[in-house]
Amino acid sequence: MYEKERQELILTLREKGITNERVLKAFLEVERHLFIPQALHGHAYVDNALPIGFDQTISQPYTVAFMTQVMNPQPGNKILEIGTGSGYQAVILNYLGAKVYSIERNHNLYLRTSQLFDNLGYRIALRCSDGTLGWDEFAPYDGIIVTAGGPEIPTNLKKQLAPGGKLIIPVGDRKSQKMHILQKTGVDSFKTTIVPDFSFVPLIGREGWKIG
């Protein structure tokens, strides 16, 4: 379904600087409309964020593509995702061969997305907990992607990143953030690149924003 719309989305992503052919193929093959409410299916392949309920959104396709291209996951890489949401980003990473561990703090959304993964046949490790604390049981990770904007970079996530791994997280206020791309170069040392202007839902948790 929506073959023409999916091809048009790929053209849009190319125009915005997404050049990794593996990433573009993932966006062509993974059907975004399956991750949003049926009433919004007609908007699934427009380059916009969309509401998915529970005061959450599915991110703009370009944003997901940008983070995925920066991460550039290789088959077998262990990737931790903070903020499962609709599940779309996790499935993109899974399609590219990564072993994905994903954390969602909203219990109702966790249940819905867990059921969706089961229905679609995706084997993604999913947990309902405070994402700012990470998932120490399976650390270290080759990459960590945070899909919500925080006031700072959680210490636990830095600790759970493998040497040479990348941590991608939007940092700023509750309305707008800059993407921080950290590559771990030593036990406590990182090379950091910062890219403006993004807008994510707030990262709630012990090392994030408080509820309210």
Predicted ranges, named:
Residues N72-K191:
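Conserved nucleotide-cofactor-binding alpha/beta core module
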Residues M1-L80, Y88-I92, L96, L109-L120, ...:
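Class I SAM-dependent transferase core
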